[in-house]
Regions:
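C-terminal catalytic "cap/lid" subdomain
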Residues: 2-313
C-alpha cells in the first residue's frame, strides 16, 4: 500500500533564474512522478531563498526609480509572488510528466498562508539567507546603503538574512486536505508559506519574514497526517564530521542520536541543522512516522530503504 508523503524541495535546487528553473522543474517532476507511479500520495512544499531575494531586489529597484509612484513591496507579498511563479512551473512540469506516463491525476498549487507568532524572537535575530550570493565588497555595500543584515553562507559567499519565525499552523490546511483526499497532487507551503499573524477579528497581517521550508513542511506533514516527510538536499545522506578526515555518512538516526549530534555541533545552521531538526520533530509527532533526508534523484530508492538517512523512533 502506498504512503502519504510530503516532499520538501529546496529553493536552491530550482536554479537562480527563470531559464534554470524551467530546466530544474523537469528533473524534479520526474523524481516526484516516480513516487506517484509507485502508488504514493505526494504533497510538495518548496523553498524560495534565491527567488524571493530576486523578487524583492527587483521591487526595491522599482521603488527607488519612481518612489512617488511605487511604494516598497512587503516581504510577505514577495513570498506570495514566489509561490505563484514557482508553483506555475512546478505544476506544469508535473502535469506534463504525469500525462507522458499516461497517469490521469490533477495537479494544483495552493496559495498558502502560514501563521507565525508576531512575538517570535526570530524577528530580532535574522538568520534566513535569501537572494543571490555576493562578494564581500557587494555585501558591505548592501549593509552600508540599504541596512541589510548579511552573513557568510557556508563558505559560498555572502547573502542577505531576514527573520525566520517558526511556523505555527497552516491557514489553508482544510483546502489542502480536501485536494489530497480527492486524489490531486498538491503543491503547498511554497517558500515556507506566506508568513501571517492574526490581528483584530479574523484579519491576517503579513509579516516581514521568510519561513524555513523544512519546518513548514514538517507542520504540513503533520497536519495532512503524512506517513513520511522527505527533505531533499544536496547530499545523499546526512554526515557527522562533514568535510573532515573522519567524516561518516549515516544510514539512519533515532531522535535521541540526532539531538546528540546537534548538541555536538555537527550540523550547520541554515543548512543541514534545520533539516535534521524538522525530521526529528516529524518522526516524534506520532507513532509510525518517519523522515528521510536525501538527494532528489534518490528519493524513490530512499523510500524503498536503499539509501538516504532515515530518521525514526
Amino acid at each position: 500500500m502506498g504512503k502519504r508523503i510530503v516532499i520538501a524541495l529546496g529553493g536552491n535546487a530550482l536554479g537562480s533564474n527563470l531559464p534554470e528553473q524551467m530546466i530544474a522543474v523537469k528533473q524534479t517532476a520526474k523524481a516526484i512522478v516516480d513516487l506517484i507511479e509507485e502508488g504514493h500520495e505526494v504533497i510538495i512544499a518548496h523553498g524560495n531563498g534565491p527567488q524571493v531575494g530576486m523578487i524583492q531586489k527587483a521591487m526595491a529597484e522599482l521603488t527607488r526609480s519612481e518612489p512617488e509612484k511605487y511604494i516598497p513591496c512587503p516581504l510577505s507579498v514577495c513570498v506570495a509572488m514566489s509561490q505563484g511563479y514557482i508553483g506555475y512551473d512546478l505544476q506544469n512540469a508535473l502535469r506534463e510528466e504525469l500525462l507522458d506516463r499516461s497517469i490521469q491525476k490533477g495537479v494544483a498549487t495552493v496559495l498558502t498562508q502560514v501563521e507565525v507568532d508576531p512575538n517570535d524572537e526570530a524577528f530580532h535575530n535574522p538568520t534566513k539567507p535569501i537572494g543571490a550570493f555576493m562578494t564581500k565588497e557587494e555585501a558591505d555595500k548592501m549593509v552600508s546603503e540599504r541596512g541589510y543584515n548579511v552573513i557568510e553562507d557556508a563558505g559560498r559567499g555572502y547573502r542577505r538574512v531576514v527573520a525566520s519565525p517558526r511556523p505555527q499552523s497552516i491557514i489553508e490546511i482544510q483546502s489542502i486536505r480536501d485536494m489530497v483526499e480527492a486524489g490531486l497532487v498538491v503543491v503547498a507551503c511554497g517558500g515556507g508559506g506566506i508568513p501571517v499573524y492574526k490581528t483584530e477579528g479574523h484579519h491576517l497581517k503579513g509579516a516581514a519574514a521568510v519561513i524555513d521550508k523544512d519546518f513548514a513542511s514538517c507542520v504540513l506533514a503533520q497536519q495532512v497526517e503524512a506517513d513520511t516527510l522527505i527533505i531533499l538536499t544536496a547530499v545523499e545522506k546526512v554526515a557527522i564530521n562533514f568535510g573532515k578526515p573522519d567524516e561518516k555518512w549515516l544510514d539512519s538516526l533515532t531522535p535521541d542520536e540526532a539531538r546528540k549530534y546537534i548538541g555536538e555541533g555537527h550540523f550547520a545552521p541554515g543548512s543541514m541543522l534545520p533539516k535534521v531538526e524538522a525530521a526529528v520533530e516529524f518522526a516524534e509527532s506520532a507513532p509510525g512516522r518517519s523522515a528521510l533526508i536525501t538527494l532528489l534523484e534518490k528519493a524513490k530508492d530512499g523510500v524503498a530503504g536503499k539509501t538516504g538517512t532515515a530518521i525514526h523512533q
